[in-house]
């Protein structure tokens, strides 16, 4: 039986890395182990430093084939920014409409992203219903606010490339929200490239198709210069699925809209038309963008270390990768690049837990509570690996509890905590104040863009 602390001291690790790992690793209610193939894929993703932001107007506007392709095959950080939450749509599964429908469609998007591997963001724009043109849309929306929120999300996510679902020149030929979303994306790009201190995406693409050209024949005749053709129908042996199958499962989460998508087997082409940025000489949308650890000063040794972990990965004993990942984590801590440091520390923390196969749950014993009511919380932990992990303690609601429990192989730990329900009443942050026809309003400025508010309680394990 080995103890993880051994790897810190025998390798002359600074103790602060161990403390940071133990205290700040988990902020969620449940962590479950993943298969070795899933862990291996995330190891490879740890070695890719590139980001893609897909942008459109509503839930279900996103092209899940493209999102899944970049997330699962290119291994880029991938996200979908939807201008609205789809409040103005139909509902084929219930009676909920308007704000209640927006809540349902928000959850449908989150379910879709869990499948295709992307992240999900929003602006505070309201889907007020069908709009004839972008001029009308941008009059009812607060154009400046939506643009500011889009710029802010780009600054936080830092995409290398942005992909618009719609064409900014399609006024009058499609939903005004659609065209407006592309216009806002291009305005954001232009504004950021006027600010030398801002994060500047390298390119903006339009995810074009024959639909935007009227028919298949017109699309065949189109000038393909500056257009990237990507085959999104490839097979992923680590999941046993084609990209089309993953995308179809993701697309089928839009149940309120009656959407379901059967996977089309074989080659499936998607086209990205360059709208803004440096022209391409190859079929690679990341052309000229360093997506390796060499993009960061001092990052080259980290890439080499991760490559060795990938080469040495034991599918029958993934826990063997945990100690070298701890060493890589210490190397990442030394970097000056705060953005990629934050992104990759989060990824590597998750990977260490998954390599060990740790199962951690911290749950309330009832789904709802009234302020002042007695509340019981239960912590469950299990470590199936032959490495000993020490459960040092837990903090929640301003209280700290020392545990110092050695999680030896498959030894179950469980402990209950009694407290009282307190704090603000849980509510979707965009619905706590009366909005306008075109915009939701909140005083929680730091939450704008998030799919949902933070959990009522957070725990540090």
What are these regions (language model features)?
Residues 3-19:
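Bacterial N-terminal signal peptides that target proteins for export
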Residues 395-402:
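Short, solvent-exposed loop/linker segments at beta-strand-coil boundaries, enriched for Pro/Gly
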Residues 367-373:
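Short, solvent-exposed loop/linker segments at the N-terminal edge
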Residues 38, 191-359:
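The feature marks non-catalytic terminal segments
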Residues 18-29:
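Bacterial N-terminal signal peptides
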Residues 382-387:
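Short solvent-exposed strand-capping/beta-turn motif centered on an Asx-Ser/Thr pair
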């Amino acid at each position: 039986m080995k103890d993880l602390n051994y790897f810190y001291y025998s390798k002359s690790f600074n103790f602060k890395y161990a403390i940071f790992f133990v205290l700040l690793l988990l902020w969620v209610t449940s962590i479950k182990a993943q298969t070795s193939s899933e862990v291996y894929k995330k190891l490879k993703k740890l070695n890719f430093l590139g980001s893609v932001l897909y942008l459109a107007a509503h839930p279900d506007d996103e092209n899940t084939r493209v999102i899944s392709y970049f997330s699962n095959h290119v291994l880029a950080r991938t996200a979908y920014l939807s201008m609205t939450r789809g409040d103005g749509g139909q509902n084929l599964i219930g009676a909920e409409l308007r704000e209640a429908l927006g809540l349902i469609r928000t959850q449908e998007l989150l379910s879709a992203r869990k499948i295709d591997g992307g992240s999900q963001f929003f602006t505070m724009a309201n889907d007020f219903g069908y709009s004839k043109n972008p001029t009308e849309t941008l009059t009812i929306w607060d154009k400046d606010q939506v643009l500011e929120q889009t710029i802010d999300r780009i600054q936080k996510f830092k995409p290398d490339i942005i992909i618009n679902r719609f064409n900014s020149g399609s006024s009058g030929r499609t939903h005004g929200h659609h065209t407006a979303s592309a216009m806002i994306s291009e305005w954001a790009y232009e504004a950021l490239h006027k600010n030398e201190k801002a994060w500047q995406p390298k390119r903006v693409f339009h995810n074009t198709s024959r639909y935007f050209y009227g028919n298949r024949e017109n699309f065949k005749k189109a000038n393909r210069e500056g257009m990237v053709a990507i085959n999104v129908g490839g097979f992923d042996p680590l999941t046993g699925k084609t990209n089309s199958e993953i995308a179809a499962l993701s697309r089928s989460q839009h149940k309120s809209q009656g959407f379901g998508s059967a996977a089309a087997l074989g080659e499936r082409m998607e086209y990205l038309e360059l709208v803004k940025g440096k022209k391409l000489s190859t079929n690679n949308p990341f052309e000229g963008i360093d997506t390796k650890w060499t993009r960061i000063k001092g990052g080259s040794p980290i890439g080499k270390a991760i490559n060795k972990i990938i080469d040495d990965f034991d599918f029958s004993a993934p826990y063997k990768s945990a100690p070298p990942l701890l060493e890589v984590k210490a190397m990442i801590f030394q970097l000056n690049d705060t953005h990629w440091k934050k992104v990759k520390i989060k990824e590597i923390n998750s990977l260490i837990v998954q390599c060990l196969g740790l199962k951690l749950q911290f749950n309330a014993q009832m789904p709802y509570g009234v302020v002042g009511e007695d509340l019981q919380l239960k912590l469950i932990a299990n470590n199936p690996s032959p490495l000993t992990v020490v459960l040092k303690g837990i903090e929640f609601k301003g209280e700290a509890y020392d545990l110092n429990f050695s999680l030896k192989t498959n030894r179950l730990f469980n402990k209950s905590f009694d407290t009282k329900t307190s704090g603000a009443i849980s509510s979707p942050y965009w619905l706590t104040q009366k909005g306008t026809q075109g915009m939701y309003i909140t005083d929680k400025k730091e939450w704008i863009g998030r799919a949902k508010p933070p959990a009522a309680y957070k725990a540090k394990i």
